[in-house]
């Protein structure tokens, strides 16, 4: 193993002695050049660390099991509560089972494609070396492993969604019972811990899958991890698309008929779509978001190993590969500590408790990562980039809250616009959504600039010590100031961020121009690793929202006491804000992960064609065509999704109106047929999955083989830029309209039942498919296209020209895309009532 490189970047002058320090703390002895199962010169110390990471993944899953037992032991409330809860549980489980059956055929076909892809393009040199130069053996083993990894990735994504959603459903009735019996703190504990199960499943399975593949395949793992990442990403796309259409079709249909036309309250039991609405919260916000963040978690592992191997080839250091896995392990531990601490804060504000716990997790991760980078790698720059990622996630909290919280002046301005009708509400929300996209973009740009600065500029040595001392003094001042004002936690974290900034400046160092691109891309990947280091916290905060919402709905349907209803309303309000915040984090992480994959795309091409330059020349008309096509696809995808929601919502509205014509249902004397609306929503969501999935998978294939690799690079750039801006716009505009409506419902500007309230409901209805369907679905769509491009890029380079086979394949891909667009953009010629009858008849005959 080459001697470790030492640099004057605020690092250890003798990293070997740092290693020995860790060894004395319990690590195994250092052995140079040890040949092992990884087929790399990896030391025993690093082997032990990797297996510890695997053990941490097991701890996360064990913690999820402990939380599950805690939730299941809680009281489920009275018979009336359990009756309504049973409808929600059965509907959610039936939906996910139907969805998995729908996508199973496509998953099976793509598993075969993953297997065959290795035989079309030879494995990487690292994979051949791993199998001692036996290319035939390498092809066969990698082909089998990639196909199995694809199945494992999609299965893990489905498990996170299914089991996480199931525990959210189990938790919601128990939250309602706790609000009736135990009060605010008990209800908060059960709601958050129910969501934490999903967070720990995401952490544990993501870390387990990536680490296991690395342990088995070592330097050949990127060839296999492509399948793992693609499987998780594709399943997440289906979960987002299907769950998003389901939840918003039911929500829009229930609101427009129930609130606007019939003047009903939220979750009125006379509304036939109320159970479908509550089911939708689980399949969309629980299962969909969990799978979404899980695949971002996977993708950053894939990128870090691909780019880490590239840097290891440059200077022989293995910490480029191992350190991201160790940071992930630290993140899991910090998430366990932080999520457990939520129930320990004695505050009557759920948001405050969750934010404090997030800060605790952030502090543990940052301090531990700096210690790891200093003692293990001897490079503080690695820790500062992870800290930038953590800071990026933390920054999205106030940024998204400013755009979407009911406490924000921006949102209250939208509420005030209800005095002038729905059009004014829509215009205010559009303005806020567009502006917030720019704010979010600049935050992401700033974080990416950090990766550029760290490896592009040399901080003068004579200023390093003074800057460190100034940072330390300012940090101490902030801590003391916080202690004097009884805000020690806030003071500590303010001081910590000041010190991080000082260390960031100190760690800046210039790398050789020839390798700078690879270093910067790895830095971007570390930012993504840092941003998702608290995946457990993020998913817990997001799942807390639908759990509280469902508990509130069960309380309304069951006629619970006003005190309990108020507790659940307060939790629901906090959940709306945390859901919006985690959407921002999910979008930001999707962009960072996509940029990392973008860099891996060029590295992948260079393995096949070493002369390929890592430049996308926009002056080339063909490349510009690729850019335009890529930029248009998020718009196409969003348009088709919104139309699908509207089409399904019309069916729900027709069904609710039909049932309300029954005087007994309208008076409350008879229970509506809730199952009918659930069935319509399920059927409507499933028929959209395959067409939209085909567009995401086939578009980069068609562009790559028709316009070649440079245009494919432009295509990806267009998808990332357009998708990020559009996703933030839709998420924040929709969230702002939602909370503007809730602000009116709290008694401002006329309150419930007023004309102003009806105007706010219109705004909320417009925003629903934006924030919960189209916007979130763009996250996995961006990464599906990037991963498909990563897989086909070597094929595009290796098979130059336009043979008959390539032209036939491209024509077939384009034909399928056209079919998918026409299928999703279809017009229903029948009236909604007639469609309901037709769909019902089809489902009855199918049964």
Question: What are these model-derived regions, one by one?
Answer:
Residues 4-6:
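Low-acidity, Ser/Thr- and Arg-rich intrinsically disordered low-complexity segments
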Residues 31-847:
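Hydrophobic packing and interface segments
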Residues 8, 12-45:
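Short, strongly hydrophobic alpha-helical membrane anchors
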């Amino acid at each position: 193993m080459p001697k470790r490189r030492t640099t004057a970047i605020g690092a250890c002058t003798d990293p070997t002695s740092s290693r020995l320090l860790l060894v004395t703390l319990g690590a195994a002895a250092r052995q140079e050049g040890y040949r092992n199962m990884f087929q790399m010169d990896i030391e025993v110390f690093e082997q032990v660390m990797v297996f510890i990471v695997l053990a941490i993944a097991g701890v996360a899953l064990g913690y999820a099991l402990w939380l599950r037992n805690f939730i299941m032991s809680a009281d489920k409330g009275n018979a009336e509560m359990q009756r309504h809860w049973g409808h929600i549980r059965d509907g959610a489980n039936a939906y996910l089972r139907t969805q998995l059956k729908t996508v199973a055929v496509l998953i099976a076909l793509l598993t075969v494609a993953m297997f065959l892809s290795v035989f079309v393009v030879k494995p990487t040199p690292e994979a051949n070396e791993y199998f001692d130069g036996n290319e035939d053996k390498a092809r066969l083993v990698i082909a089998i492993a990639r196909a199995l990894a694809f199945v494992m990735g999609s299965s893990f994504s489905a498990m996170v969604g299914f089991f996480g959603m199931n525990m959210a459903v189990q938790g919601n009735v128990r939250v309602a019972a706790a609000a009736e019996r135990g009060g605010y703190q008990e209800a908060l504990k059960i709601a958050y811990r129910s969501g934490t199960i999903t967070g720990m499943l995401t952490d544990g399975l993501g870390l387990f899958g990536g680490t296991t593949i690395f342990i088995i395949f070592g330097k050949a793992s990127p060839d296999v991890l492509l399948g793992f990442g693609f499987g998780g990403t594709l399943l997440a796309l289906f979960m987002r698309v299907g769950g998003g259409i389901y939840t918003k079709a039911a929500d829009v249909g229930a609101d427009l008929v129930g609130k606007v036309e019939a003047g009903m309250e939220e979750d009125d039991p006379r509304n036939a779509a109320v159970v479908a609405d509550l089911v939708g919260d689980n399949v969309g916000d629980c299962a969909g978001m969990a799978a979404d963040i899980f695949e971002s978690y996977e993708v950053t592992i894939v990128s870090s190993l691909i780019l880490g191997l590239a840097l290891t080839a440059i200077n022989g250091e293995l910490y480029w590969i191992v350190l991201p896995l160790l940071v992930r392990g630290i993140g899991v531990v910090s998430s366990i500590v932080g999520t457990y601490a939520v129930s320990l804060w004695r505050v009557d504000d759920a948001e405050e408790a969750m934010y404090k716990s997030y800060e605790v997790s952030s502090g543990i991760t940052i301090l531990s990562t700096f210690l790891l980078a200093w003692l293990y790698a001897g490079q503080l720059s690695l820790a500062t980039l992870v800290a930038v990622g953590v800071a990026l996630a933390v920054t999205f909290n106030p940024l998204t809250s400013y755009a979407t919280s009911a406490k924000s002046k921006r949102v209250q301005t939208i509420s005030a616009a209800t005095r002038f009708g729905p059009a004014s509400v829509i215009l205010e929300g559009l303005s806020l959504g567009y502006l917030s996209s720019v704010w979010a973009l600049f935050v992401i740009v700033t974080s990416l600039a950090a990766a550029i600065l760290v490896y592009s500029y040399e901080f003068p040595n004579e200023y390093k010590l003074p800057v460190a001392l100034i940072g330390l003094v300012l940090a101490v001042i902030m801590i003391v100031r916080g202690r004097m004002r009884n805000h020690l936690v806030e003071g500590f974290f303010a001081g910590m961020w000041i010190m991080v900034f000082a260390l960031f400046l100190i760690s800046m160092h210039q790398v050789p121009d020839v390798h700078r691109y690879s270093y910067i891309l790895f830095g971007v990947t570390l930012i993504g690793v840092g941003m998702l280091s608290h995946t457990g916290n993020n998913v817990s905060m997001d799942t807390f929202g639908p759990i509280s919402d469902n508990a509130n709905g069960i309380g309304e349907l069951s006629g619970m006491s006003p005190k309990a209803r108020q507790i659940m309303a307060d939790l629901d309000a906090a959940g709306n804000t945390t859901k919006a915040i985690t959407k921002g984090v999910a979008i930001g992480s999707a962009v960072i992960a996509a940029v990392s994959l973008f860099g891996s795309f060029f590295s992948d091409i260079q393995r096949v064609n070493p002369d390929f330059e890592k430049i996308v020349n926009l002056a080339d008309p063909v490349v510009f065509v690729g850019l335009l096509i890529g930029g248009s696809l998020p718009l196409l995808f969003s348009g088709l999704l919104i139309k699908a929601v509207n089409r399904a919502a019309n069916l729900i509205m027709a069904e609710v109106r039909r049932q309300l014509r029954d005087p007994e249902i309208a008076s409350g004397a008879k229970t509506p047929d809730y199952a009918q609306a659930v069935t319509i929503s399920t059927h409507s969501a499933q028929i959209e999955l395959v067409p939209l999935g085909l567009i995401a998978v086939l578009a980069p294939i068609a562009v790559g083989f028709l316009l070649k690799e440079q245009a494919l690079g432009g295509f990806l750039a267009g998808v990332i830029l357009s998708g990020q801006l559009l996703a933030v716009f839709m998420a924040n505009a929709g969230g702002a309209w939602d909370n503007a409506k809730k602000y009116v419902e709290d008694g401002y500007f006329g309150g419930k039942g007023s004309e102003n309230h009806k105007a706010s409901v219109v705004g909320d209805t417009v925003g629903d498919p934006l924030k919960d369907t189209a916007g979130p679905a763009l996250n996995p769509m961006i990464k599906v296209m990037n991963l498909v491009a990563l897989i086909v890029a070597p094929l595009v380079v290796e098979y130059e020209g336009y043979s008959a086979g390539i032209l036939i394949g491209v024509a077939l891909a384009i034909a399928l895309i056209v079919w998918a667009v026409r299928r999703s953009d279809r017009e229903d010629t029948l009236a909604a009532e007639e469609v309901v009858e037709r769909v019902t008849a089809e489902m009855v005959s199918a049964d």
